[in-house]
């Protein structure tokens, strides 16, 4: 038995024990990002914003584009909750540019949906419509009928907000046609009725 005492700073987890496997614990930007998500889930937007801004700076210093995009996306979400729609759009657009550079199609669509909501909240229905048409093109190209139906419903709503009821009816009839093609008779009839109602308003 030895009388020598091991220095405290030499004591750490046993290699391979799993205690040192979480690299996020060693990355302040990831720690801040994780804390921001926790605050956001509790609707503590001030603390969440502080954490995400700190994470953003850390990710930028590391050159971690994915982290930068994620932080901008979350900060945009906070701005939406605080009804700061212009700021939200700025953050979503920054995330969008990174995702476009990375050819991350799914993230691009998700960000576009958030941008549509921000434009609608700001009353900029023409820009909302332009972005929705891009989303619809994506769903058409990828043969995604569920996604197409979702965005066509949004398009119909915006046309109605703009007072363009005939165009809203066309979008609703397109949805009815999609449902009819998949044998969803009742849903097709429902959308046909909604189209007729939109025309008569």
Regions found by a protein language model. Give the residues of each.
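TPR/Sel1-like alpha-solenoid repeat signature
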Residues: 32-39, 51, 58, 68-79, ...
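Flexible helix-coil transition and linker loops at the boundaries of alpha-helical arrays
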Residues: 19-23, 59-65, 99-103, 140-143
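Terminal, low-structured helical/coil segments at or just beyond the last alpha-helical repeat
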Residues: 2-9, 177-201
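Long, contiguous interaction/recruitment modules in multidomain scaffold/adaptor proteins
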Residues: 1-27, 31
């Amino acid at each position: 038995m030895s009388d020598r005492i091991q220095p405290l700073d030499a004591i750490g987890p046993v290699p391979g024990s799993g205690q040192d496997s979480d690299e996020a614990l060693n990355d302040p930007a990831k720690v801040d990002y994780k804390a921001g998500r926790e605050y956001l889930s509790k609707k503590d937007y001030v603390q969440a914003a502080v954490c995400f801004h700190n994470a953003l700076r850390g990710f930028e210093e590391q050159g971690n584009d994915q982290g930068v995009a994620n932080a901008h996306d979350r900060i945009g979400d906070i701005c939406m909750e605080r009804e700061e729609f212009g700021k939200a759009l700025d953050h979503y657009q920054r995330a969008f540019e990174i995702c476009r550079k990375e050819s991350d199609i799914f993230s691009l669509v998700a960000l576009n949906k958030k941008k549509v909501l921000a434009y609608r909240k700001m009353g900029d229905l023409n820009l909302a419509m332009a972005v929705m048409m891009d989303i619809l093109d994506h769903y058409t190209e990828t043969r995604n009928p569920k996604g197409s139906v979702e965005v066509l419903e949004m398009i119909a709503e915006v046309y109605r907000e703009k007072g363009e009821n005939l165009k809203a009816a066309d979008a609703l009839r397109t949805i009815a046609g999609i449902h009819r093609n998949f044998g969803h008779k009742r849903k097709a009839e429902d959308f046909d009725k909604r189209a007729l109602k939109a025309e008569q308003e």
